[in-house]
Amino acid sequence: YKDNALVGTAPDASFYLFRTEDGANENPVEESYWVEAAEKADSLGVDVINTSLGYFGFDNTAYSHTYNEMDGKTAFMTRGAEIGVSRGMIVVASAGNEGATANPNIAVPADGISVLTVGAVNASKTVTSFSSIGPSFDGRVKPDVMAQGQSVVLSDSSGNIVTANGTSFSSPVMAGMVASLWQAFPNKTNKEIKDLIIKSADRYTNPNAQYGYGIPDFSVALSNGLGVNDFSVNDFFMYPNPTSDICTVSLSEKLDEGVLRIYSIRGQKIAEQKISKTSPTI
């Protein structure tokens, strides 16, 4: 958050920053550093982990991953991410920026079965050329969802408002939305929140390797989370419908009176009134 300049997707959240990356080198031990950080995050009560990094190739190519290891259960870091989810956290991870390379697929830990993997689209909702693709080696839909990762507005280390590209930015955009949605439903599990997000996405019924399930609509996710099962009764009916003023409630012969309560889609009670056959309007 920057006053009068920038509001992120979870501006009132509390954050811990864990630096597990060795910027000068790329070695397998960094996966262990990440798992150690995830364990520490769990001990601190963290709900959502954002991971803006991924591992596939290492400086010593003998240790590099292969695509057949992107199965959600082989890489050390991915297994650590799965343990984090089993502890109740939501792990959000960048899909990777290798979409235009000879090895365009997702990297560790984006292959995780329970990890919410985020690819990148531009402001026109078109997948970027660099966004790594799926599926996982075992055929699961990856990435899971998409968020803006091209020309993302952000604050740099000096506090300047700039734009940048990468799934390293689409992932935290999504992680903030995840946190905000979970705040609306604090009693739901991490799996339930993830399911709400995926089922709200615009390609949920027709996913593919570039977009996964697509771009989530968090207003739909919120509505679905608040939803109740449809039901019908024959003891009364209301008219006119729709109305912007007075509404009449017609009770059946077996009902003489009752209490009518009206709730908004957010679950807030907006009206309550006793009604009867002699006083049927609200």
Label every PLM stretch briefly.
Residues 1, 15-22, 47, 105, ...:
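Hydrolase catalytic cores
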Residues 1-30, 44-47, 58-61, 86-88, ...:
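Subtilisin-like serine protease catalytic core
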Residues 8, 14-19, 47-52, 83-85, ...:
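Structural recognition of the beta-strand scaffold that forms the well-ordered cores
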Residues 28-34, 38, 58-66, 93-113, ...:
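Active-site-adjacent substrate-recognition loops and nearby beta-strands
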Residues 49, 141, 256-260:
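Short beta-strand/loop motifs in extracellular/secreted proteins, especially
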Residues 71-88:
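Catalytic-core regions built around general acid/base machinery
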Residues 209-227:
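A recurrent domain-boundary module in secreted/ectodomain proteins
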Residues 231-282:
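C-terminal outer-membrane/trafficking sorting elements
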